[in-house]
């Protein structure tokens, strides 16, 4: 029988070989095996945990194996062992012996090496190893090892925090990125909220429509109007719904996989219409399946930056981005994303903004959002857009969010909104609201 550690190793190898998302691969992999709920939890903790702490574990492995080249599979297996030793309540003998047995299955000659590395790591102790690895290092290198983030991401987060008046929060943010997030549900309708409350679910702290999931989220998705959605994403759609003309036609410009579209659909259901663009066929199908009444909403397989077929009273541009705001849920992103990808992303974001401005009716609202706090994708992008489009103005979004969620600690000196996992318990969503002049 395949055990939990072997499944976790296979998952890690697949994620790294194909640059896939662990949250997509994990359910499919678990469905192939008949294992207990406890082992399912073990697979999840091992795979997510190692992906989060990969850089730190690699630094420890390299320190304990100077001059040696390890195969990817062997390195992954030792990472699993280190995670059990240092961050799980697994007995030392079990963490080491199970790892050695795992290595014997695919690289017998390396069993002794894996045993030696783990025993030396256990003898040295986690804190002592970190002290050795960070001694004499600059702050950026120290933070990179301590919190297992690439240096370029730490620098980007630092700049974003400084702009938001939170320059002292860097360590707290990096730590939050390594925490396991609570699964959040959204009750799109009041009837759905009543059902979730009757089941004993607690309200979320950030979104007025949010609930904290208990157990398997699939158990709640049969309730009409209930979706799995981070509270930050909920607030994007709810804020747009609050400020836009509900009698008009709205556009969700980059709508896949459909979570925000479902919220917008409900907002315009009485007197307006919703159109959804999504360039990828599979994701467009996900949008359709997320809608309550797909026949009343046009889901078009279309690129947002292409010439619009009509004009809209309100547009949501949830732009493609580096995705660094969701590192809690997608830990592998810190290793698959690179700074070299940013120029093409920011170019696409600018093209999408320009297309959205063209497609807006006079007086129309454009909600720009990213699941990334990087300044180049957020405030810098908005400043550049306002420079290009004299007929657009920035609307103060802070009062809108404060009315939706009075408990949020927002920076009231700026008109845009940046959410943070360590402060708000959400993904690091950015939002900006722009309005087109009435005469243009």
Residue ranges and their predicted role:
Residues 1-440:
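S-adenosylmethionine
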